[in-house]
Amino acid sequence: MKRSAPVQFAKKDVANCRWLGEFLVHLESTRNVSAKTVTAYTTDLIQFFEFLTDESGHQEMSAVDPELVEVADVRRFMGDLLDSGIKPRSIARKLASVKSFYRFLLDTGKIERSPLSLVLTPRLERKIPDFLSEEEASRLFDQLVLSDQESVGPEQGQKAAVQRFELARDRAVLELLYGCGLRLSEVTGLENADVDLVHGFLKVTGKGRKQRIVPFGEPAAEALRNYFEVRRNFFRILKEGAGETSKVFVTAKGRQIYPMLVQRMTKRYLSPVTESARKNPHMLRHTFATHMLNGGADLKSVSEMLGHSNLTTTELYTHVTFNRLRDAYTKAHPRA
């Protein structure tokens, strides 16, 4: 019986899998990973040991000893996932979870060898990310500025006030997604104390709760100043809401904005300026990286601003730079 679909897990599943509970505590306390990441690791590992339980004919996961797992077991698991139509990228992620678990067992002296040492991660095709051209980015923010200015009219009442507030907020959110290359979780989690308008930088808390400093330009600074003023006036009139959270970006009810709101917002504003199928917040992060490298920024600096742990991830964006150089060569060289 195949177990390729992700399983729903409970505390008893974790308890039944030897050493899994200790590994999850290690992730949370030592590596500072998010709850979402811990859930992903747990799901992947329980799926792995559920598969081994079925393969071995046992009734309970507790009967499967991680120390006795062989290379062939891991390869059969990967083959089962592939046969079930799981994409190579998802298989690679699941394999990475299993590798992390066994690395923990080795590091803590629970086992002397890992069956993962001879298992290679599937080779993945690195897709070029969607991004806006510089002209499309200009149209996006020209549209936002115009909408923001038009919202300051004679209309009165709560509906008009909410519209002015949301336009100012949306413009500031999109300026930071593009101007600083922030991740969705980073912009929704941004604290008031993280914004330094005087010196023009943000203190960003990224993956693994790692913090970094990211500069921003005058357009983003102007959008933030405008938003802070509109937000202050809006909640002063309402006399409620804004004091409930320390977050920069809030809803009209004063609560922290949530990912789906930003995703809908991004799609709405990107739709008039690009035909790309992926109109999401990450597209603006891709655009930030692409435009920075095209403008001559060095790879290491862009990598630091994006919060990448290694340069390899950032190198994905250099394709545009190479294309630009190829175009220049083709147009200029007599033997191109």
From Swiss-Prot:
One of its GO terms (cellular component) is cytoplasm. Residues 127-330 form the Tyr recombinase domain. It is found in: Cytoplasm. Its main location: cytoplasm. CDD domains: INT_XerDC_C. GO terms for biological process: cell division; chromosome segregation; DNA transposition. Pfam families: Phage_int_SAM_1 (PF02899), Phage_integrase (PF00589). The active site is at R183, K207, H282, R285, H308, Y317 (o-(3'-phospho-dna)-tyrosine intermediate). Residues 14-106 form the Core-binding (CB) domain. GO terms for molecular function: DNA binding; tyrosine-based site-specific recombinase activity. Keywords: Cell cycle, Cell division, Chromosome partition, Cytoplasm, DNA integration, DNA recombination, DNA-binding. Belongs to the 'phage' integrase family. XerC subfamily. Site-specific tyrosine recombinase, which acts by catalyzing the cutting and rejoining of the recombining DNA molecules. The XerC-XerD complex is essential to convert dimers of the bacterial chromosome into monomers to permit their segregation at cell division. It also contributes to the segregational stability of plasmids. Forms a cyclic heterotetrameric complex composed of two molecules of XerC and two molecules of XerD. This is Tyrosine recombinase XerC. It comes from Chlorobaculum tepidum (strain ATCC 49652 / DSM 12025 / NBRC 103806 / TLS). The gene is xerC.
